[in-house]
């Protein structure tokens, strides 16, 4: 299998119509925006794209639509996470048949299985396809289960297509331990930052990044990522600090803040599905004022 190098991966939101159906017209426009503004690859539907609020059939249709719309311009990483192993494996097979370039999954939601069953969960999903297979180590309070370096090494031994780990746990010691051992077991094993805090991740050995904020600040993210890949970590710090400020601004509202920020930048993608709650008018206006006041965003695109 040729080495998979995802680079800077943009994570589009899932646009919804006023009656909360997937808005495929706007999804196509959003995909084009990301491709035209620095994405090396796209991943969807991720948690930033409200994947847990999409029905199984909707996930399949979104992946099919994205593959056709991208039309080979960039690789698509299909996110197939589910609490059920067989459900996630079936979605992975569907994504491969649709034309995805790689598969991404996290630990099973809600359940807290023992390590041997987390290993089995990942192994069955990865074995369902021949594509590069990526595991996402999410924060434990979100995922419900913790991924260990030992478990990842066992998965390397079982799966030839296990290509790398996406980490958004911010557990730097875990990342250090994993990359030191994993690259001995599998040269070329990918460590991918699951957040925009790329400077710290790059210092450990991350070579790619998933970026939910790419819809807001694609130029800033591209600049920071390129400096990190050139090992110019000191020079990347200023951009990293600006990105950290943007993350902090949007953190409390999560997807609702992300969608409100997109609307403020002229790329309205609707509001989140329940149980998430959209920002009220006052909160959205306050967010718009804060975004407009950020000097780091002055060179970022407005509109589509």
Residue ranges and their predicted role:
Residues 2-146, 301-302:
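Active-site beta->alpha loop and helix N-cap motifs at the rims of alpha/beta catalytic domains
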Residues 10, 46-52, 167, 197, ...:
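Short, flexible micro-motifs
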Residues 24, 28-31, 149, 284-291:
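Short, amphipathic alpha-helical "lid/cap" segments that border enzyme active or binding sites
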Residues 27, 59, 63, 88, ...:
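A general structural signal for well-ordered alpha-helical segments in protein cores
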Residues 35, 200-304:
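Structured C-terminal cap/extension of enzyme domains
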Residues 36, 68-72, 97, 127, ...:
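Secondary-structure boundary motif
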Residues 127-128, 139-251:
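Catalytic alpha/beta core domains of metabolic enzymes, predominantly
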């Amino acid at each position: 299998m040729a080495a998979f190098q995802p680079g800077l991966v943009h994570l589009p939101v899932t646009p919804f119509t006023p009656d909360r159906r997937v808005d495929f017209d706007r999804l196509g426009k959003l995909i084009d925006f990301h491709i035209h503004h620095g994405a090396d690859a796209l991943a969807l539907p991720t948690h930033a794209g409200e994947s847990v609020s999409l029905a199984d059939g909707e996930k399949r249709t979104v992946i099919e639509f994205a593959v056709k719309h991208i039309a080979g311009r960039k690789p698509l990483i299909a996110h197939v996470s589910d609490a059920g192993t067989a459900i996630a494996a079936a979605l992975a097979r569907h994504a491969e048949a649709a034309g995805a370039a790689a598969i991404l999954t996290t630990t099973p939601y809600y359940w807290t299985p023992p390590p041997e069953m987390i290993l089995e969960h990942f192994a069955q999903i990865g074995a369902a396809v021949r594509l590069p297979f990526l595991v996402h180590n999410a924060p434990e309070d979100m995922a419900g289960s913790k991924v260990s370096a030992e478990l990842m090494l066992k998965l390397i031994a079982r799966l030839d297509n296990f290509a790398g780990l996406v980490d958004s746990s911010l557990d730097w010691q875990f990342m250090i331990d994993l990359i030191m051992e994993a690259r001995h077991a599998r040269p070329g094993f990918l460590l991918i930052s699951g957040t925009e805090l790329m400077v710290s991740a790059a210092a450990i050995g991350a070579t790619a990044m998933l970026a939910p904020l790419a819809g807001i600040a694609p130029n800033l993210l591209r600049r920071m990522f390129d400096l990190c890949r050139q090992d110019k970590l000191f020079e990347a710090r200023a951009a990293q600090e600006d990105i950290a400020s943007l993350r902090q601004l949007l953190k409390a509202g999560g997807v609702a803040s992300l969608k409100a920020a997109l609307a403020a930048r002229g790329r309205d993608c609707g509001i989140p599905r329940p149980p998430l709650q959209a920002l009220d008018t006052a909160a959205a206006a306050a967010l718009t004022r804060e975004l407009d006041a950020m000097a780091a965003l002055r060179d970022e695109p407005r509109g589509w």
